[in-house]
Amino acid sequence: MERYEVLEQIGKGSFGSALLVRHKQERKKYVLKKIRLARQSDRARRSAHQEMELISTVRNPFVVEYKDSWVEKGCYVCIVIGYCQGGDMTDTIKRACGVHFPEEKLCQWLVQLLMALDYLHSNHILHRDVKCSNIFLTKEQDIRLGDFGLAKILTSDDLTSSVVGTPSYMCPELLADIPYGSKSDIWSLGCCMYEMAAHKPPFKASDVQTLITKIHKLIMDPIPAMYSGSFRGLIKSMLRKNPELRPSANELLNHPHLQPYISMVYMKLESPRRSTFPLQFSERDATLKERRRSSFSNDRRLNPSVSDTEAGSVSSSGKASPTPMFNGRKVSEVTVGVVREEIVPQRQEEAKKQSGAARTPRVAGTSAKASTQRTVFKHELMKVSNPTERRRRVSLPLVVENPYTYESDITALCSLNSPDVSVNTPRFDKIAEFPEDIFQNQNRETASRREVARHSFSSPPCPPHGEDNSNGSITKDKCTVQKRSVSEVKQRRFDTSSYQQRAEALEGLLEFSAKLLQQERYDELGVLLKPFGAERVSSRETAIWLTKSFKEASV
């Protein structure tokens, strides 16, 4: 527990509480789930320990990330899992205020949930509590299935008979006290998809007996007609009364209606877009990444058809995520070829026309669609490009000799078009809400103008022949150049050890912060004050210098 800093309590229930914590070294937010053991039944204690052991073995991109777990003083089971900023699906439906989600979004969520359930069922794990409040969303609106408190590892007969779960999501065989298996999770998923589409649960009643009757007789309102017949048919197939007639997660993933969305989900898995650079690297991680890249390059040279997934690509967090499987094959083997046949010719023509532009590294301004297509067709782009130029993966922003060393990432940071500040400070140049006049002089200055400015500052211009320049007056243009050079020299000569200059800069920082606060621009204010942490390197001097530059540039 000493490795984490408690931020706030985000949930509380009869068995424990959920706390938002921050890892002190990683500076990353997690959720600490504390399950109380005192004054609980033996079954509840066993369930808590089982959840801790079970979730530590689960590794899937669409299941909540497991970080750590321990038993605290014999009174609490503590489980640290990944924090999903998007909240749960129940809150997402409430925030929609009756506005239906697009079918494309629902299909993407369905595919991600099916991949999570297929992974669990293939490992003989029953979730047994699939409901909207246990489906979480990341900041990018991706699914994470959580809460394994009622999960169970199946026995050899693949059936269980315990009556657990939420009544509104219980399958008919469970209510009839008939042994059930993985098809019970499919029923619960069908109820969730119905609720996502209709913004209300399929079976709802004021008392339990009426609810059971509605479930047994399948009494529910029709799914909104705005969705296609194929999509509505998928949901209805998951809500069949006979479990033998319900499709499995593997069979649903092979449905023709979901194939395009499987391709989209897999391409997003294969090439995650990174918006930040890691500030710290360990030598061990760098060595492993370098070996993996070297092995992957050798495999691709021997066999150009080798995909990133077969070579074992990793996400930006550094942990390998298992490739979703269905029908005995990897998703890449089933779907990527279909998309490639449709739009390869168009991409090859564009690559030939823009071969020069493709070699220029781009950091911002690319759309998600372009980034995704570039990921799928990186093999084709390599064929039409110059064979002598160095190749790079699209998830990296720059072409470097050794992409996985600490020095190369510093080189990538230095080559970005950003203010001359420490790499530990926030990226002010990426904040679109700042006024344009702050960076106007810096972006428009060229090397020739800087040279003229330096000369004009070091040696005053000679007066024209026949004119008396004893009063020191110069033309308007020359005065402007001289003013720029003075500001530039002041920025270069700013001494952080000077108390007077530090006081002036701090005063400017307070004025600038007060201005942001008055305009209710809290995001920019938070980014401006973020460098003042004790763990940063020269953060105060860097922030003072940067604020003084802003103040002088706005004069």
Curated annotation (Swiss-Prot):
Residues 304-320 have a biased composition (Polar residues). Residues 288-328, 346-372, 443-477 are annotated as: Disordered. The gene is NEK4. This is Serine/threonine-protein kinase Nek4. It is an enzyme of class 2 (transferase). It catalyses: L-seryl-[protein] + ATP = O-phospho-L-seryl-[protein] + ADP + H(+); L-threonyl-[protein] + ATP = O-phospho-L-threonyl-[protein] + ADP + H(+). It holds the Pfam family Pkinase. CDD domains: STKc_Nek. SUPFAM superfamilies: Protein kinase-like (PK-like). Keywords: ATP-binding, Kinase, Nucleotide-binding, Serine/threonine-protein kinase, Transferase. It comes from Arabidopsis thaliana (Mouse-ear cress). May be involved in plant development processes. Signal peptide: none annotated. Its EC number is 2.7.11.1. GO terms for molecular function: ATP binding; protein serine kinase activity; protein serine/threonine kinase activity. Residues 4-258 form the Protein kinase domain. The keyword NAD does not apply. The keyword Hydrolase does not apply. Gene3D superfamilies: Phosphorylase Kinase, domain 1, Transferase(Phosphotransferase) domain 1. Belongs to the protein kinase superfamily. NEK Ser/Thr protein kinase family. NIMA subfamily. The active site is at 129 (proton acceptor). InterPro entries: Kinase-like_dom_sf, NEK_Ser/Thr_kinase, Prot_kinase_dom, Protein_kinase_ATP_BS, Ser/Thr_kinase_AS. ATP binds at residues 10-18, 33.
